[in-house]
Amino acid sequence: MTPDDIKLLQSRCVSEVNVDPNVLHAYQSNAECADYNNGMLNRIDVPLVTIRATIKAPLGLRNRVSISEDGRVGKTAFVESLNIKVGARVKLVYNVWTSDSLVNGAMGNIVGINKTPEGYVDFIAVNFDKPKAGINQRKKYPKQHAKYASRNGTPIFRHEMSFDLSKRVNSGQGTVTQFPLKLAWAQTSHSLQVKNVME
């Protein structure tokens, strides 16, 4: 980099105080993102909903299931405990329906957390930034969509993903079932994709 490049970059630096908290924040580490995302989640004055993943592994191998520092199960992007609220900024971490733009990295806001009479969360309604994202999903599940149609809520359901219990061949596989979402006010610069950042 030239001295002029450095000068230009330094002229673009802003302090945290001057940044709108709702704009997308890029950080270097998952820990920094988690701190910011949890702080933003705590600002929303509605009840917190915690959804635990269902994790299965062959008998005697459950202790081999690894949970990363940021809560991901095995080598998947699904989290062991998903903490969300209506109004939370989220992104998909799994290709739900690629031709319907419900792809890994698609971002939006939670407009509904639908529970059964027993309190089981059966789907999460997300208003995606790209209005056409989820059109087919909304048509496929008209009853679920109708509840959140005024806010263009697309129903997102749990998905199951398999993962290896270790790097060794034939070490066994486990499965995790969880909503393919994560908080997204902040993301690592590594995970950001220009196509997913709307103006």
Which residues does each predicted region cover?
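Conserved helicase motor core of P-loop NTPases
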Residues: 1-100, 115
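Conserved helicase C-terminal RecA-like lobe
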Residues: 96-97, 102-199
